[in-house]
């Protein structure tokens, strides 16, 4: 296939050229499948590809505008070298054109010196969004192969940190999505699902429309009447940053006023029956150290995986192993009881009656105890979802706020069941012939779920891997400071901040070189002046389609290929481009449509060449 594609591209300037080439978009991380119309060697139109399950034939306005990226008059066509040693926004870098050999020789020399001294002094950053999306995954592998832990995400500190960590800890997945095929009541906090932005945006927009036609009620909690809210059954304006208060008030109504919860689910699939002692910690079996529950069947404490455990208590006070204790569910109800709708109303500006009504509708729509038969298997049916994303966790205490949303679904049993919130995708059974790739959640400490694959890690117990079990903080040896963060997920802005206080963080080396693969980190990582100071301290190699604010601080700029000019075997990950639930899960190969201009080259083959040169 690749050879056939190259022949088509190589013959692009042929007379009477008029072809449609299937490929994959890269204007955002969704990577929708597209068809590209090339006529007489020129791309004239981009459409969605109806033959692919990735995007379901849809394409957004940004995707259609990819032609402007391809033919931008500011595209770089040759490597550039800085001649002005002063780096600042007001300084002309004094760019001069150089050959690829000179560029790669210079970079190789720097890398060999770092490799001999301390590989950790090399850093790399890329993004899952936009033209460099596939390069993000490769950059992580490249840095790991070189021996450096300092690969970081350039999307900034608000890119999914709370949602991804909750998805990993609660679903064994990287992300969560609603099961739109069977959901009947959806509450949206700060998300653009179906309206203007989200995972698998174009596919989920269609699925949202189908669900609305089917009768799903949509309630949007958002300060702004956005593209989702304008299509909702109900838009509830809320004071920015107060979503967590409303979630807790809804939880209070469901647990303490209505008394509606899925006891069977909570007992079988959560740690909420674990007994909690006066110190706030699990009561543990002194023999094996395992947390215990109270079995109502024979009125005694048993560890969580005791095969004789049959009816864990959710409420009550007990004495176990010499300690007076209560199930975690009791503490959850007590914690929620402090958040009355009236109190939450003062904080959120949402009327108390509205909070109480939405909570009641949500609990009722959950149909606790109902089942559905799918493909011959009877499964729990909980057709309610709470959807949240960047708008909800772009504030302080985002992890706790999102935990509140997640708990709403947990208490009614609407997690990883038809109609509820699904992890994407916690289990992969692998290719039937080879068994690869293959992953599934595993039982972590204390019996709690830990993802089989998450954020690029696939082996249980890897220190920088999954969000659960949490890591013990240790003095940092990486610029990401993940050593200090128990459940952190690649916070992109922290290397910039850590570089300002290397002595304070006691990091035992100072980075000397940085690869910037695509993103404009001067803007994406926060304070431009702080990021500029970060860039001034290193030799910077930037792979770019055009010059931007970040290249003011680059030493060498390499002209990259646009997504319509390159071959990518796996454009992005399934959590980004496939809806959750049933469906045809697949990857769509990105195929080149035209050649790169001038001497522009796709950065991944360039980095592979650098790897060969460095050895």
What is the predicted role of each segment?
Residues 151, 259-265, 353-356, 385, ...:
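Acidic/polar loop patches that form or flank catalytic/metal-binding clefts of enzymes
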Residues 129, 268-273, 361-362, 378-379, ...:
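A glycine-rich phosphate-binding loop feature that marks nucleotide/adenosyl-phosphate handling sites
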Residues 137-216, 221, 245, 310-316, ...:
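Extended redox/cofactor-interaction regions of prokaryotic respiratory oxidoreductases
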Residues 230-238, 561-574, 586-596:
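Short beta-alpha connecting loops at secondary-structure transitions
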Residues 1-264, 268-313, 324-325, 445-457, ...:
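N-terminal export/assembly segments and adjacent metallocofactor-ligating motifs
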Residues 345, 390-396, 592-600:
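Active-site rim elements
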Residues 582-615:
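Long, C-terminal catalytic modules of enzymes
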Residues 82-84, 103-123, 176-186, 334-336, ...:
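Glycine-rich phosphate/diphosphate-binding loops that line cofactor/substrate pockets in enzymes
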